[in-house]
């Protein structure tokens, strides 16, 4: 896929990524308004990749293979698309779902497409002293290892949540634009280095 950005074999642009690490986008959540009322039962009966169990959840769950995604389609015409690995693929998938709904006889449009959340991840390749980090950044951190093994770091600017694991694996969530994911990681990277665990 051409849209995967800087991941892979190309050299990293150090002006944008001084750490030399580019977080990989793992999941994009987007929404769009099909702008018409939908008969979910009819959609579930006619579309072969759809399931609908109104007692469990008030939406049709539909999946496509390319781009590998899942859509939640509501009777109001609102749709949520998850699972794409880039913004471009998320929009492409959402358009495919809209087209499926159109082919089933609904006057579906494609209004107000919006990226709602970008989840990225990376590995700094060194272990991190989470206790020390949590203590010195207590205003932004919550770390309760008996409940969850990662430290939850709530960055203010950009407004992003990072899950930081002792292994050096990082999950970055809450961005609406990939640049926020990258900025958040570059902001936290010096802190991670400061709390690098020294191997005995």
UniProtKB/Swiss-Prot annotation:
Q: Which organism is it from?
A: Arabidopsis thaliana (Mouse-ear cress)
Q: What does this protein do?
A: General transcription factor (GTF) that functions at the core of the DNA-binding multiprotein factor TFIID. Binding of TFIID to the TATA box is the initial transcriptional step of the pre-initiation complex (PIC), playing a role in the activation of eukaryotic genes transcribed by RNA polymerase II. Interacts with TFIIB1 and is required for activated transcription and possibly basal transcription. May act as GTF of RNA polymerase I-dependent transcription and rRNA synthesis. Forms a ternary complex with PBRP1 and the rDNA promoter region.
InterPro entries with a match to the protein in the record:
TBP, TBP_CS, TBP_dom_sf, TBP_eukaryotic
Q: Where in the cell is it found?
A: Nucleus
Molecular function (GO) terms for this protein are: DNA binding; TBP-class protein binding
What SUPFAM superfamilies does the annotation carry?
TATA-box binding protein-like
Q: Which Gene3D superfamilies match?
A: TATA-Binding Protein
- Pfam families under this entry? TBP (PF00352)
Q: What is this protein called?
A: TATA-box-binding protein 2
Task: Set out the biological process GO terms recorded for this chain's protein.
Answer: DNA-templated transcription initiation
Subunit comment:
Belongs to the TFIID complex together with the TBP-associated factors (TAFs). Binds DNA as monomer. Interacts with TAF1 (via N-terminus). Interacts with TFIIB1. Interacts with PTF2. Interacts with HAT5/ATHB-1 and ATHB-7. Component of a nuclear protein complex containing at least TATA binding proteins (TBPs, e.g. TBP1 and TBP2) and ATX1.
The record's principal subcellular location, in a coarse class, is nucleus
UniProt keywords, alphabetically: Activator, DNA-binding, Nucleus, Repeat, Transcription, Transcription regulation
Intervals holding sequence repeats: 25-101, 115-192
GO terms for CC?
nucleus
Q: Which consequence is recorded for altering residue 144 to R? A: Unable to bind to TFIIB1
Keyword Membrane attributed: no
Report the sequence similarity comment from the record.
Belongs to the TBP family.
């Amino acid at each position: 896929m051409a849209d995967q950005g800087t991941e892979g074999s190309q050299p990293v642009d150090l002006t944008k990524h001084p750490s030399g690490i580019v977080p990989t986008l793992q999941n994009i959540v987007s929404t769009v308004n099909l702008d018409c009322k939908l008969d979910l039962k009819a959609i579930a009966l006619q579309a072969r990749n759809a399931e609908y169990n109104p007692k469990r959840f008030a939406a049709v769950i539909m999946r496509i293979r390319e781009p590998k995604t899942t859509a939640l389609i509501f009777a109001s015409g609102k749709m949520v698309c998850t699972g794409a690995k880039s913004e471009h693929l998320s929009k492409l998938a959402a358009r495919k779902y809209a087209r499926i709904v159109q082919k089933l006889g609904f006057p579906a449009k494609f209004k107000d497409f919006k990226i709602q959340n970008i989840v990225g991840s990376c590995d700094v390749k060194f272990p991190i002293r989470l206790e020390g980090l949590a203590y010195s950044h207590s205003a932004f951190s919550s770390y309760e290892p008996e409940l969850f093994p990662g430290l939850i770091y709530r960055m203010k600017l950009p407004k992003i949540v990072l899950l930081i694991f002792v292994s050096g694996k990082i999950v970055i969530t809450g961005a609406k634009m990939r640049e926020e994911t990258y900025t958040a990681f570059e902001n936290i990277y010096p802190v991670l280095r400061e709390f690098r665990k020294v191997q005995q």
